[in-house]
Amino acid sequence: MPVSRSPIEDLANGFARRHIGPSPQEIAAMLRAVGAPSLDALMGETLPAAIRQAKPLDLGPALSEPEALAHMAELAAKNQVFTSLIGQGYYGTAMPTVIQRNILENPAWYTAYTPYQPEISQGRLEALFNFQTMICDLTGLDVANASLLDEGTAAAEAMALAERAMPKKTKAFFVDRDTHPQTLAVLRTRAEPLGWQIIVGDPVSDLQKADVFGALLQYPGSSGALRDPRPMIAALHAKGGLAVIAADLLALTLLASPGDLGADIAIGSAQRFGVPMGYGGPHAGFMAVRDSLKRALPGRIVGQSIDSHGQPAYRLALQTREQHIRREKATSNICTAQVLLAVLASMYAVYHGPEGLSAIARSIHRKTAVLAAGLRKLGFTTRNEAFFDTITVDVGDKQSEIIARARDENINLRIGDGTLGLSLDETTTPKIVEAVWRAFGGALSYAEIEPAMRDALHPTLKRTSPFMTQEVFHLYRSETELLRYMRKLSDRDLALDRAMIPLGSCTMKLNATTEMMPLSLPGFAHLHPFAPPEQALGYHALFDKLETWLAEITGYDAVSLQPNSGAQGEYAGLLAIRGYYKSRGEPHRKICLIPSSAHGTNPASAAMAGMEVVVVECNDRGDVDVDDLRARAELHSPNLAAVMITYPSTHGVFEEHIRDICDIVHAHGGQVYLDGANLNAQVGLARPGEYGADVSHINLHKTFAIPHGGGGPGMGPIGVKAHLAPFLPGHPCCDDTGPDGFSHGGGTVAAAPWGSASVLTISYVYILLMGGDGLKRATEVAILNANYVAAKLDPHFPVLYKNERGRVAHECIVDPRALKNSSGVTVDDIAKRLIDYGFHAPTMSFPVVGTLMIEPTESESKAELDRFCDAMIAIRREIAEIETGRWKVEQSPLRFAPHTVHDLAEDHWHRPYSRAIGCFPAGTARHDKYWCPVGRIDNVYGDRNLVCSCPPIEDYALAAE
């Protein structure tokens, strides 16, 4: 039990003091700088009085770090880690410890942001490029993305891609009945609001007569069946449909690739490549497509371009496809994906190489074949003659006794109708196979059965094409070399372990080591998501408490932890609204009002939920134009479903009229969706569920300390008021009744019941350590830090939006647009020049084109804030030199930025400023300078000359001839 302490002691001596950057003395100095007598007075000038919560958060006392770690060890011990042979897309793995220590547990990798500034992201971009190369080679297709959320959502994205790409009148999609049930559930959820029909059947007998725009085939099947899909694909193509194969990535080292089989799209999960099951995630989903479909591919794509020196450099390619550009017309609402997990999977492939992966696959297949031979000897019939790692066994009325004996052996099996399924993996040993035989009633010896084993791969489906011939998959076989390769890549990146990342709307706060440590505990890492619930008591205690805490913090009545990104949380929340109206006989309510300043995921999610987006204007202060909102709500009153509003606004201000906005929408029968992206400005001060919102998603990877991982993982749980609770996401593989007592009967939005469950431990520990008072203080300091930055920068770069009392919320927008006219300097020039000062740029051109949005969070010290502000002010002085004619903009340090060590080492320097000004501006420290590895990257060249995977080694050989 924790030692009882007062709230003042907790803040002064506890973890909160470590999490919050400024010291009490610095806070006092910063308050003087912004002209506020106290934090409470500043909050009174920042937040509308009408939304302030009256009671403190009831979260219990904060724990010390040792107490929290001991508590997490107790929870992990309550989870029973059985040998799970359930399969169904989740398998035991062995992550190489060199990868675990140097990537998964390394803040240089997990604290980075999405690589929108590619010059300072070359390390993880190269790792993602390797991931894409691996996926393209194994699937036999031309272009892959840099990860999706999981296999289920990847399947739904593939279905949507097929519908967009095939202009057929039919709105039906065929799904192989041997598809994983969670994948089918996600497909049905995605299809229903869009009016698409899901046809489930046997592709051998049913696909040829179906009129569909596409079909999904599981390869191998969920039951383990291994069938040649070529005749089915040919029949589908003959009728104008696209073929999607959901593939087992490890099996593809032995089996013919989807591309060779004629598939147009391949999807799946890279979990088998060394990533623990984690009770459902996070894992990197993947998608690969034929070249003709590349511009419809959802998610982020890493491409190769050149920098200002003509050297190869990586960047995000084809970004105009993405939701922040195309909004409701985007290919997808996908934003955060699973970058850290894709990096882990790519390094697993680098570690083992193609020969090692094939050897693992052959070993698994051999053990599965031996297992099947033993079961046949015991008198059981296996359903499939051809298989890779999974067999389905007819057991009839013996099922219960076999399950009981298997539990005695600490083994979980997949339970079917008179059948049992068994899926083996790289952790399966001969002793486990013998234990399975004992569960089936026989004491057999592996050594005696093995000689009778026969290859059970389909004879016409064996892989003949080479894969992963590129050098990167062959160079780093010793741990020494791999360790240095990973270090080399991480040194190329700028993450939170090196400097503040002031990205607006991203909340790049501290991801504390203590919060991260439980992630690696076996009790959390190695549970199968469909293991019996009695084996996951620790997880369920954590889920119940976390849901209760999040409901307390937000003022909602019920919470779902299933959505595994903020965008998926938006989608799930809108589906809950849709389900509510359907239950009331009002399915026609489909109008969604969205302010023009909204993040692009809002309209993209609304479109996915089958809603029609109507844009609401903003006024000159950046607030929602209440008169325009009222007029549009009245116009669409009979069909109004919701308003989606971000609060504080994306303009960095608490709008005074938020209660009026909620009242207007409610008066016309609509619901209020309050985007939780900016919840870090409200925790402990205001609760959305109390001032009028009906539903919000909660970005745990922002407000509640899950690291961004370079672009994922994230988690986007949703909180709802009681009337929407019955429509929270459900799942076909579990009971979804939460601690709130509501049964969650909505559609499935993620492959696993609790999304990326293992990273929920991070937010849980964060709240444990902070307590209610610590969380409130963090919010107050986040707002103070933003106002401090705004006050320092306003004389140099005008702050675009403030409230009536001159305050910003937790972020501010500075406006350099006038400087483009006076000097020719662009916002991109400023962003790249900040790299020379050792900083990641703020958010560029969102929500206002040509501006910078800055969010310092509560975790940055006054010294780091001053260093950033000094850099911005120094850049303004450099711009003044251009304005006065000292430099032409084309020959200025801003246009040549970022400067690299190659610039410093040039024999001849022909620029009108010195090397010192270029490389060490305004006296920046020389002893620990971050050196950008490449010059400014040519985005246009990269999109015109799209290269998204490494060429095979044969191409190098041909080029050398």
Curated annotation (Swiss-Prot):
InterPro entries with a match to the protein in the record: GcvP (IPR003437), GDC-P_C (IPR049316), GDC-P_N (IPR049315), GDC_P (IPR020581), PyrdxlP-dep_Trfase (IPR015424), PyrdxlP-dep_Trfase_major (IPR015421), PyrdxlP-dep_Trfase_small (IPR015422)
Gene3D superfamilies cross-referenced by the UniProt entry: Aspartate Aminotransferase, domain 1, Type I PLP-dependent aspartate aminotransferase-like (Major domain)
Source organism: Rhodopseudomonas palustris (strain BisA53)
Name assigned to this protein: Glycine dehydrogenase (decarboxylating)
GO annotations of cellular component type: cytosol; glycine cleavage complex
SUPFAM superfamilies documented for this protein: PLP-dependent transferases
EC numbers, comma separated: 1.4.4.2
Gene Ontology biological process terms, A to Z: glycine decarboxylation via glycine cleavage system
Reaction catalysed by this enzyme: N(6)-[(R)-lipoyl]-L-lysyl-[glycine-cleavage complex H protein] + glycine + H(+) = N(6)-[(R)-S(8)-aminomethyldihydrolipoyl]-L-lysyl-[glycine-cleavage complex H protein] + CO2
N6-(pyridoxal phosphate)lysine: residues carrying this PTM: 702
Keywords per UniProt: Oxidoreductase, Pyridoxal phosphate
NCBIfam families per UniProt: gcvP (TIGR00461), PRK00451.1 (NF001696), PRK04366.1 (NF003346)
Protein encoded by which gene: gcvP
Known role: The glycine cleavage system catalyzes the degradation of glycine. The P protein binds the alpha-amino group of glycine through its pyridoxal phosphate cofactor; CO(2) is released and the remaining methylamine moiety is then transferred to the lipoamide cofactor of the H protein.
Keyword Oxidoreductase annotated: yes
Family: Belongs to the GcvP family.
One annotated GO molecular function: glycine dehydrogenase (decarboxylating) activity
Binding partners and assembly: The glycine cleavage system is composed of four proteins: P, T, L and H.
Cofactor(s) it depends on: pyridoxal 5'-phosphate
